[in-house]
Amino acid sequence: MGSGKGEDTLIGFFGRVSYGFADKYNVLLSIRREGSSKFGENNKWGSFPSVSLGWTISNEKFMEGTRSWLDNLKLRAGFGVTGVIPGARYLSLTTWALGSPYYYDNGTWKQGLKVDHNPKPHQKWEKSTEYNVGIDFAVLGDRIWGSIDLYHKKTVDMLWEYDVPVPPNLYPRTMANVGEMRNQGIEVAINAIPVRTNDFEWKTTATFAHNATKLLSLSNDLYETANRHYIAYLGEPISLSTQIMEVGKPLGQWYGLKSVGVSENGLWMIENPATGEIVEFNDNMLTDKETWYQNLGNAIPKVNVGWSNTLKYKNFDLNMQFTGQFGFKILNEARAYYQNNAVTYNRLKDAAEAPYGDGNVLKPAQKQTFVSYYLSNGNFFKLSNLTLGYNIPLKENKYIKAARVYASADNVFTITAYNGLDPELSNGDPQYSGIDQRDKYPTIHTYTFGLNVTF
């Protein structure tokens, strides 16, 4: 048990100028100037400009022949810089912690103080520079409208921890602004009103997003580290990494032993990625990663989709919200720990079954470990929310202006092949993406009934 106290300060200024001409051309300029106590004394302030340009092509004279069906066509382009503030408060300062060495004073051993963080007066903002182009459109009397955006974002001065010599440093590891990463992708949103009559209307929106990441660098002339790092470690007793973060490659790469079956001895059968040879599991495979480990897929969805529908009939309305993610794999951490006969507690019933359906069951000799068997296709499409409402007809009065009753359900159903509780994950740490943690509180179905009254 312990307690702590800390404080930090953030101050910012913002300015914006916009200009439009002839209802065709638009310019927006903005700048933010922010200062944070979390940065080093030499870099507490950051400036973040942005520029966006717009051209409404549909208002040009040469587009007059399209106005019977084209309501809006606008081309957009933008550039902007944003800054990221770290979560920890005192990364730029020397910090101390209680611990060894102990010293003997007047018959008692007393705990000493030790440095546990190097000062970094030059610590600065992580900055992301983004370029984007997009198009807005509307056709057929605004019955169909939407947008398409392409973006390219580069983040520099990302914080990473490095080994440093002692002395001159007080602590053998330090954080520094060195890393670089790239994100690029596409976002599409399409809206439509397929049906509209006096009593009935159906409005629908579909969204599509794809993002690709690439780690560009983790080293510079002053701070150097390996181009490959093993991350996303599982806890005891497995204590193994499940992913790699590698310069020149996308984030979220599953990396480990590829299992293809179970031997008659009840041990995993592992594929050698170089030769294709199938070998019975042994502990040396866990340390000889260069020989036995291989890429097992990615933890980050390639595609995110959404689909919302609103249907109105007289005083009734029905809203449906669908979401989906595709092109990724999930690590079922609970199965990695408990679908194994080496454990005597919380063992899953599936541990008594053959993982690959060939009659060979894992035996107690097979230690808990991470293999590809515990990765599952994470694709899903779910009805996230369903709401049915009714607007109560009211006689005109001075007390109540409107009244509506509704029933709503969240997390209604999910279409997926995933063998865990819920494929929609929300891990806060990007270095643990794709892990369905064994101690996660399960997603619940929620049902709500309500009454809204406007006075």
Q: Over which residues does each language-model region extend?
A:
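Conserved SET/PR-domain catalytic core that frames the SAM/AdoMet-binding pocket
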Residues: P301-N315, S384-G389
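Membrane-proximal, glycine/serine-rich, low-complexity loop/turn segments characteristic
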Residues: P86-Y102, D221-H229, P250, L257-K258, ...
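Extracellular/periplasmic, surface-exposed regions of secreted and cell-surface proteins
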Residues: M1-S241, Y374-F455
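Extracytoplasmic gating/loop element in the C-terminal half of outer-membrane beta-barrel translocons
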Residues: S36, Q325-V412
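Short glycine/proline-rich turn/loop motifs
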Residues: L113-V115, M285-E290, K363-V371
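Tryptophan-centric aromatic hotspots in well-structured domains and transmembrane helices
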Residues: W55, Q123, G261, G266, ...
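Short, flexible active-site loops
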Residues: E290-W292, V303-N304, F316, K367-Y373
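Gram-negative outer-membrane beta-barrel transporters
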Residues: A176-A299, K312, Q325-F328, A334
